[in-house]
């Protein structure tokens, strides 16, 4: 195998996001449900036998903070593989949107290179590498919609009803760090239970980060008001700045504020690459 083309990296929406506390080390405790949607980046991988890692759209030296580059380097370091890769990306998921685009790209890179380099790493091994890259990377590696708790490390798969969602990304983005460090952030939400969520999956709870985001980024409020003008009740995903609303019928996408990205998306039951890495637990159970 010398190449892998058209590898999908889907975005996610946070159906709700509650902050339930803050640890002594500064990390926030949260509850959320992460749902995959069909707004995707597309990645292409060409094998390099010289051991080098390169990106079609980036000159050398490669930026240290690029998640795709970091994922490839982390997998190479963990495996000791002498092989390299040339990566191309068709970037569609907006940055600083709360949709997990960078983390999803990193996860798809780990899964693809596990095949291209013939490493046969287990899913658990890839997740341990993904944890070094970002809190959302393990979710995308897991391949299923999930109930998420703790600082984001506790995940349980959930089955969600299918849905269509109008997603709106303002021109401005938001830095996660600024949202979580804001003194006005609500950090004392009561602990939710999954049965309460299941009774109203697409309307449960709220996003505790939203009020802070609206103050820092007026575009969030503009996007929510535009959804409301279409008769839709919206909320922010993640730390923003994208917002979304479930829609049961076709919506006129015209008239959005200038420069805003608007897309009608469908939920995904599973990640397009689910099964690309085998779980250790599955291997033991089927032996």
UniProtKB/Swiss-Prot annotation:
ATP binds at residues 94-104. Keywords: ATP-binding, Isoprene biosynthesis, Kinase, Nucleotide-binding, Transferase. This is 4-diphosphocytidyl-2-C-methyl-D-erythritol kinase. It is an enzyme of class 2 (transferase). Pathway: Isoprenoid biosynthesis; isopentenyl diphosphate biosynthesis via DXP pathway; isopentenyl diphosphate from 1-deoxy-D-xylulose 5-phosphate: step 3/6. GO terms for molecular function: 4-(cytidine 5'-diphospho)-2-C-methyl-D-erythritol kinase activity; ATP binding. GO terms for biological process: isopentenyl diphosphate biosynthetic process, methylerythritol 4-phosphate pathway; terpenoid biosynthetic process. The active site is at 12, 136. It comes from the Bacteria. Belongs to the GHMP kinase family. IspE subfamily. The gene is ispE. Transmembrane segments: none annotated. It catalyses: 4-CDP-2-C-methyl-D-erythritol + ATP = 4-CDP-2-C-methyl-D-erythritol 2-phosphate + ADP + H(+). Its EC number is 2.7.1.148.
């Amino acid at each position: 195998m010398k190449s892998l083309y058209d590898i999908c990296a889907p975005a996610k929406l946070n159906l709700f996001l509650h902050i339930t506390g803050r640890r002594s080390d500064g990390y926030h405790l949260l509850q959320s449900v992460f749902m995959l949607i069909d707004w995707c980046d597309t990645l292409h991988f060409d094998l390099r036998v010289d051991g080098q890692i390169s990106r079609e759209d980036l000159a050398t030296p490669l930026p240290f903070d690029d998640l795709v580059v970091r994922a490839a380097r982390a997998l190479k370091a963990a495996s000791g593989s002498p092989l390299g890769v040339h990566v191309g990306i068709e970037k569609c998921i907006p940055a600083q949107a709360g949709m997990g685009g960078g983390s999803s790209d990193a996860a798809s890179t780990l899964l693809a290179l596990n095949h291209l380099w013939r490493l046969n790493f287990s899913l658990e091994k890839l997740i341990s590498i993904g944890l070094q890259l970002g809190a959302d990377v393990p979710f995308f590696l897991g391949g299923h919609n999930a109930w998420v708790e703790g600082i984001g490390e506790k995940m349980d798969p959930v089955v969600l009803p299918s849905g269509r969602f109008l997603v709106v990304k303002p021109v401005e983005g938001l830095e996660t760090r600024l949202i979580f460090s804001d003194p006005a952030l609500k950090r004392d939400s009561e602990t939710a239970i999954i049965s309460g969520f299941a009774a109203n999956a697409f309307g449960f709870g709220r996003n505790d980060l939203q009020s802070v985001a609206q103050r820092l980024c007026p575009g969030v409020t503009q996007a929510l008001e535009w959804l409301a003008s279409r008769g839709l009740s919206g909320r922010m995903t993640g730390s923003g700045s994208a917002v979304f609303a479930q829609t049961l019928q076709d919506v006129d996408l015209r008239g959005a504020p200038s420069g805003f990205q608007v897309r009608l998306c469908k939920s995904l039951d599973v990640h397009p690459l689910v099964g690309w890495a085998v779980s250790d637990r599955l291997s033991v159970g089927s032996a």
